[in-house]
Amino acid sequence: MSKNQNLTKRLVISAVFIAVSIVLNELTPIKFPFGGSVTVFSMVPLALLGWTYGIKWGLVCGAVMGTLDMLIGGLGNFAWVSGIVAYIILIFADYFVAFGVMGLSGMFKNKIKNQTVAFGLGAGIACVLRFICHFISGVTIWADYTDGWVGAWIYSLTYNGGYMLPELIITVVGCCAVINIKPIMKALEK
């Protein structure tokens, strides 16, 4: 396959996986009132992109997903904050970076012998980093809705942890399952 064909294939697969991630992101058994939800494996396609094509590619694909998520359903959150700094923190912490870090899921590929463990661990760490992004957003721009800084820390920890802990578990289980589906992994690695 030529270099241009390989790039075209990578772009098409990435676009399809981002689209699948967006659709899965809308399947929300639990949706929180000020953003955030427990989804049905929506982070797995992003994690697969980071695993298959590398961290840099995965970071970009995750940031694209974050941008689309913001445009599709996250614009309502802007009504709750005011000021340019708050908008910038919201855009980066809750969308670009939070979803971008899912591309780090491939960080242990070929570094840990058991690839199921490597992918699951990478996806788990990526989800923890995503939680940290949302936590930072919570203690900075959402602090006005709590009683002081201690209240903001506890609020952000419980609110964001309330959906990110289940999301972490679902993502790790999904990644550990999908890496063992040989036809999918073989098709991606062609």
Regions found by a protein language model. Name each.
Residues N110-F131, K190:
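Internal alpha-helical transmembrane segments of multi-pass membrane proteins
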Residues S21, N25, D69, G73, ...:
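Juxtamembrane/transmembrane-helix interface segments of polytopic membrane transporters
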Residues W51-Y53, L104-I112, A177-M185:
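Structural signal for the C-terminal ends of transmembrane alpha-helices
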Residues L11-V16, V44, I55-A63, I88-F92, ...:
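Hydrophobic alpha-helical transmembrane segments
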Residues I18-I22, M65-G66, C127-F131:
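Residue-level recognition of pore/gate-forming positions within transmembrane alpha-helices
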Residues M1-V60:
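Hydrophobic transmembrane alpha-helices
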Residues M1-I18, G120, V150-K190:
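Alpha-helical transmembrane segments and their cytosolic interface
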Residues N25-V38, V64-G106, A143:
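Interfacial aromatic-anchored transmembrane helix boundaries in multi-pass membrane proteins
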